[in-house]
Each structure stands twice: as structure tokens, then as C-alpha cells.
Amino acid sequence: MKKMPEKHDLLTAMMAAKEQGIGAILAFAMAYLRGRYNGGAFKKTLIDATMCAIIAWFIRDLLVFAGLSSNLAYIASVFIGYIGTDSIGSLIKRFAAKKAGVDDANQQ
């Protein structure tokens, strides 16, 4: 009996997700380095970097959806890591408020 009969299927699945994984690693590294450089606490920096990696995992699909080249995924992943989840969240809130027609001066 083989030790790991599903090894080839596992390797195939890992190779299929290689591009997304590289983008996630780039975003994680950039967010972690940015957070530590700015003097952030280790735990907060690690959580922010993980959230950036999750967002960057799907950036290739978002670029294709937007009609842009998927070759921009690596630089977009680094950009995601650089701006961080706080900036991404505020951009999404601003976009949603504009679409909903909300004009509140107290929005950040």
C-alpha cells in the first residue's frame, strides 16, 4: 500500500494555486514590513498582514472581472500590502456611501 496515494492530486492543486499564493505572500510580507516599520504591535501587524494576504488571494479574479490584465496581480498584491486593510476599508466605505447617495460629513 502506498503511503500517500493522493500526492499527485495534491501537487496538482498546489500548482494550480501557485500564482494566487505568490500574490498572497507578497501582500503579507509588505503589510507585515509596513506595520513593523510604522511601530505597530506584533499581533495587530500579523492580523493586518493576514487580512491583506486574504484580499490579495482574490486580486487576480478581481482584475479579470474589471477587464484588466491578470499580469498586474503581483504589483496589485504589493500595493494591497502597502496601503493595508484600514485604507482598503475606508475606500470601500466611501464607495458604498457614494453609491447609496449618503452625504454625511462625519463619514471617514
Swiss-Prot record:
GO terms for biological process: killing of cells of another organism. InterPro entries: Phage_lambda_GpS_holin. The chain crosses the membrane at residues 39-59, 72-92. It comes from the Viruses. Keywords: Cytolysis, Formylation, Host cell inner membrane, Host cell lysis by virus, Host cell membrane, Host membrane, Late protein, Membrane, Transmembrane, Transmembrane helix, Viral release from host cell. Induction: Expressed in the late phase of the viral replicative cycle. It holds the Pfam family Phage_holin_3_1. GO terms for cellular component: host cell plasma membrane; membrane. Residues 1-38, 93-108 are cytoplasmic. The C-terminus acts as a cytoplasmic regulatory region. Belongs to the lambdavirus holin family. This is Antiholin. It comes from Salmonella phage P22 (Bacteriophage P22).
